[in-house]
Amino acid sequence: MDNISNHAFNYPVLVLNKGLLPEHDDIALARYLFSALALAVSRITQNEEMIVGFHLHPQEITRWKDDECIRQYILPLNIRFNSATPIAGFIREIMTWMTPDAIHQKNAMGASVLTLGPQHALHDIFDLEISWQPPVESEPVQALTCHVASREDALVLTLRFNPARFSATQMQKLPEVWRQITASAAKNGAETLRDIGLIDDAERQRVLHAFNQTEQAWDGETTVAARLKNRAQRHPEQTAVVFRDETLSYRQLYQQAGALAHYLNALETERERCVGLFVEPSLTLMTGVWGILLSGNAYLPLSPEYPEDRLAYMLENSQTRIIVTQPHLRERLLALAPPGIQVVTSDDVDAFMRQHAHSLPDAPQNDIAPHHLAYVIYTSGSTGKPKGVMIEHHSVLNQMNWLAQTVGLNQETVILQKTPMSFDAAQWEILSPACGCRVVMGEPGVYRNPEQLVDMLAEYRVTTLQCVPTLLQALLDTERLTHCPALRQIFSGGEALQKHLAQACLETLPDCELINLYGPTECTINNSAFRVDPVSVRQGPDTLSIGAPVANTRYYILDNCLTPVAVGQIGELYIGGDGVARGYLNRDDLTAERFIVDPFAPAGSGRRLYQTGDIASWNPDGTVQYAGRADNQVKLRGYRVELDEIRSAIETHEWVKAAAVIVRNDPFTGYQNLISFIELNAREAALMDQGNHGSHHQSKADKAQVMLQLANKGCREFPAASQPYTLDLPGKQPDEKQRLTAFSRKTYRFYDGGAVSREDILSLLHEPLLTAISRQPDALTLDELGHWLRYLGQFTSAERLLPKYTYASPGALYATQVFLELNGVAGLTAGHYYYQPVHHQLVRVSEQAAVTPGSLRLHFVGKKSAIEPIYKNNIREVLQMEMGHIIGMLDIILPDYGLGVALCDAAALDPTPLAIDLDDDYLGACDVLSGPRLPTDDDLDIYVQTAGANIADLPVGTYRYVRGDLQHIADDVIDKKHVIAINQAVYERSSFGISVASRTEGWAGYVHVGRKLQRLQMNPLNIGLMSSGYSSETGNDLPAARRFWQILGHRTGPYYFFIGGRISDEQKYSEGMREDAVHMKGPAEMIRDDLAAFMPDYMMPNKVLILDEMPLTANGKIDMKALANINVELKHKTIVAPRNPLEHQVMAIWQAKLKREEMSVDDNFFESGGNSLIAVSLINELNATLNASLPLQVLFQAPTVEKLAAWLSRARREPVSRLVQLQPKGRQAPIYCWPGLGGYCMNLRLLARQLGAERPFFGIQAHGINPDETPYATIGEMAARDIELIRQHQPHGPYTLWGYSFGARVAFETAWQLELAGEVVENLYLLAPGSPKLRDERVAAMNRKADFDNPGYLTILFSVFIGSITDPELERCLETVRDEESFVAFITGLNPALDDGLVRRITRIVAQTFEFTYTFSELQQRQLNAPVTIIKAQGDDYSFIENHGGFSAQPPTVLELMADHYSMLKAPGIDELTSVIQYQQSPPSLVG
């Protein structure tokens, strides 16, 4: 390999001297290069199988013309790689096989040729392509493409790669790995891929040796049996074991275990046999384990909870001949055990000891050696058959010694033995008497009962508890762990521990130590440990580290070639040391496969490693980060994906208690789909009808609630055959006031109107007295009656899917019906009438009327069938509150007619004339009377709460509203988690909450609190409210009510809670559905939306399914097999064809530019292979063809055919912001970044993408790029206008500002102006703020004059478009360009896709800004408080800022790159830039 350089597009270019290659004709060279490159790619990616597209050399096309596998002259191959195969031999085999005669034959490598159907997009399936065509920048690349050009003396190879599939680090390693492979092939030696190293010697020393300094010599006993004997001799009367009201001292434990050991030795003289232990949690379990150990045998736990088939297999496979059990389990054991098994109970032992006790010591004096077998644990096998893991005494002793010394197990420790004994993790609980601990034996099945578990922790004053994260979460959910004051240690293991769970645990138990443990059964219980620090965990990763290896344990993280990986790189974890098991019982084949010779140990040492199958990486501090299972690594959507990484990301969501991810093949298409199962955390994500909820409260994908809302199921239905008298009321068409009343009374979920003050809340709560001229109901005309009844009807709008009402209804189901009972009113016949709200009609249901002449009464009926499909609990409560909402609306409306309402005594009413269905509820009635009649609210207690700093003059806390003032009663408030999950985002946006409690018990109290909310909602103050919780008469109080009673210290009567904030006029007068989006999405959809904000698209689940409970295995882990059997209905990705002429026109241009035959109108431009050059060409073509004036940045706001066509079709064009969203995802505050000269943001896209999804990234396009824009005259004006733009998006700081090249000056000026305005700038990053040094002597002495006669200016202008000052075309530019016209012609000649208007506009921006600089005095006046980081490019001159001191209150951080001014924003230079930035931003403790 002669050299490595960079292509104009900055892809790696390799030049290979033909004379140094073993083959000399081009066809043989092509195969040689292909096989060597494929090996190199396999080595750096760890892929052991790849699909490769080999473009036939032009000279051999005719030889292949008849082969049916060839498509478009491409040979599609499936290549497998064996890291142990000699490199030279592999290359020879491939070259021999890749001929028309041999390609379809079997071969030693297992390679094959693929037959592709027409449905396969040819280029999309390849991991690697070898092409003889030159690279074309506009063509998308799916993975890695090598373009080969043959010269007389050399081959020139240009590598184009997809950064989403190959990291820049991998591409930087590729040439060197390729060089090593070709060198090995040339020597024709025996080297394999395992001999090709990827890390240097220093890193190798670090990960192999420095991180494995765990040697520890233990003094004293050599077995745990000897440790127990020693303990019994030194502390005979100390309590060792407790079960219910029974106890064993150490002396008793040793004696009873010794008695069993004597009896076992009498039955069986051979040692190291498996003795089964078939017992329930009890003292017998403890004496059984120790008795078997003292007998010199190995115990085999046989849990009575296990299926009989599993137990039978374990007995057969282990060849067990003796089983210890309890008397009451004897018959059950005999029924499942094979013939010849000897069953031992305490009765047998007691009988034996009565005969021999006088002649026997406390325990047999067996010579138990460290290498003897201690126990056998059966663990699940991949074949479905469990496998027995053999653990020796020295391994157990090492574990117990480490627990005693490092974790602190001693005589003060009280352990709850609750883990089922058949699991590896239970063994240290059972064997802990060897450390002097007291063991409390848990009740059978206690590990499945969190409430009972907490009771035992408290009763027995347990100090140390072990549990899987799933159980830990369940214990926290009891909210009773604080009742366990003795608890000082919690060990978590068995599953990945998430940060939010660790934080919740330590916040609940601040004096308790939390230790994360890890270890496969094959390596003796716990192999690594991580003590969770309450402070640093907040800044740590979402999934906690599994820690560092324990004493006498070695961790190796290796790639697929069994070579160590660098810190931070992913590999498979191999474990060595004292904990490694002997192997699998009677499974020599599997033992040889999983227990390998330690390649890092001296030859002949006998040391072995266990291959865990777990994926992990080293942290800089020597701890290990677990990343999932190797068998959970799948190739999905072209990407290699860790299912555990996706699960871990989902579990960081605060609503998620547990998650699991599986891949399922679509039965229709055969494609793989990613399915995520989620169990919600009920404490953080409460559901309506919690515990009795339907699936629609978890997901609204089926739109069941919306369909009910549209069906008007709350209306009364009459049989067609007996249709009663129906009157069409006047006033069906609402007037403007009625529409305004209906649409301004919303359940507001957004608060865009600004801050709320204490005075605003007092004004809201102080309802003015209503004054109006009183009238009697009999004075109403039919027109007036129709007019005010219209307020009870439906309102519709072209902007809404759902109908609108003037009053609130739970679930917007409007299940409360209104009936009028009238006598002598509006000329109508006396009787009862149903008001039909959809058609604005009165339907007579009875000609009876109990009211006196001239009277009007309203009756309310709840139609339960309209609400029961959605709500299961509190149906009567919400219907009564809806009745209150209607009456509250009438309180506001009727005074305009001289009327008011008063509640009737429900007990005195007869609903018989209404002829309601038996299943419906009669709710009550109110009389319409003369004059305004607002209730006094004397029986209501009103409270206000504020949270956060939302109200400046009202500190956080809960207040009681008393006589027009607010009195502070508590600092505590109803928190976000106390409102149902789908409303929590509204809570975060709100400014305050109001609680209303009625002193009137029963249903009348619910009417009153509902009436109060409705009147408050209809306020004229632009304050919006949303109901967020209520009490229950039927025992189903919502969390907000329970929390409020905690704050008060007692329960109230009927209770209602709502939150609110200030709304804008636009919200108030809107007839749209923005506030009603909650009906469209449930927790499943909202979680998926949240995941999309920080998870790459290829990792997004196709389906998120919420389960009431995760299925669990017996040891508390998620049962993946049970999940795989759950039926999941999948939505299929369909191609949406253009639906109108405009979409057809846009699609045609789109397909032509992206070179795609099949596309959907919802396909994303950038995800479909679009880049900057294609974007320019596409927009130019659209503008020319459609006579439009689309700005370039429109593709960021409308990146699909569908959205772009909709944008074009709007009569009024929405202005496209110069704030260009380059990376929208992230939970942190955004980054605002200015591009270089010319002001076009497209070259910042790769930077935005490489930084990841932690925070959004916005580029700020220069004013002047779009047509009809004029560049700003000064930097000061540019910054001022850009600040206006930024503040529209983020009103207040702290701000993060970046600037590249010339953009660094604008970023600096913007930071200064923001600080001048009192804002905080958190960070200012200046990327390559200096100009590139111009090496040509004609331009080296450049000046700042923007003139085409100035070679320096022309060079920089050229670089704006070409991205280089060394391109060969620069010389021609300097020679031929004399003015703007000739420059525009020159650039568009080089790149015809560029529109001359765009080139001209960018040129003028460069001309305007080229001369911008600060004077000395201007810089002297500008001193920033913000921390400044300067990242210098290789070869740049000093920047404007480095020549001046004092521009920053604190010294700036200056970092230098190897990449130059232009390559730092391209691959692979971008990798160096982002690495430097991420290193700089890392917390000091994590930087190693």
Swiss-Prot record:
Keyword Repeat set for record: no
Keyword vocabulary terms for this entry: Lyase, Phosphopantetheine, Phosphoprotein
Reaction(s) catalysed (UniProt annotation): 2 FMN + 2 L-glutamine + 2 ATP + O2 = indigoidine + 2 FMNH2 + 2 AMP + 2 diphosphate + 2 H2O; FMN + L-glutamine + ATP = 3-amino-1,5-dihydropyridine-2,6-dione + FMNH2 + AMP + diphosphate; 2 3-amino-1,5-dihydropyridine-2,6-dione + O2 = indigoidine + 2 H2O
Function: Nonribosomal peptide synthetase involved in the biosynthesis of the blue pigment indigoidine, which is implicated in pathogenicity and protection from oxidative stress. Catalyzes the synthesis of the blue pigment using L-Gln as a substrate. Two glutamine molecules are cyclized and oxidized to form indigoidine.
GO biological process assignments: amino acid activation for nonribosomal peptide biosynthetic process; secondary metabolite biosynthetic process
Gene: indC
UniProt-recorded name of the protein: Indigoidine synthase
Species of provenance: Dickeya dadantii (strain 3937) (Erwinia chrysanthemi (strain 3937))
Xref: InterPro entries: AA_adenyl_dom, AB_hydrolase_fold, ACP-like_sf, AMP-bd_C_sf, AMP-binding_CS, AMP-dep_synth/lig_dom, Nitroreductase-like, PKS_PP-bd
Residue list for modification O-(pantetheine 4'-phosphoryl)serine: S1172
Family according to the record: Belongs to the ATP-dependent AMP-binding enzyme family.
Comment field on protein domains: Contains only one module with an adenylation (A) domain, a thiolation (T) domain and a thioesterase (TE) domain at the C-terminal end. Contains a putative oxidation (Ox) domain integrated into the adenylation domain.
Gene Ontology molecular function, alphabetical: lyase activity; oxidoreductase activity; phosphopantetheine binding
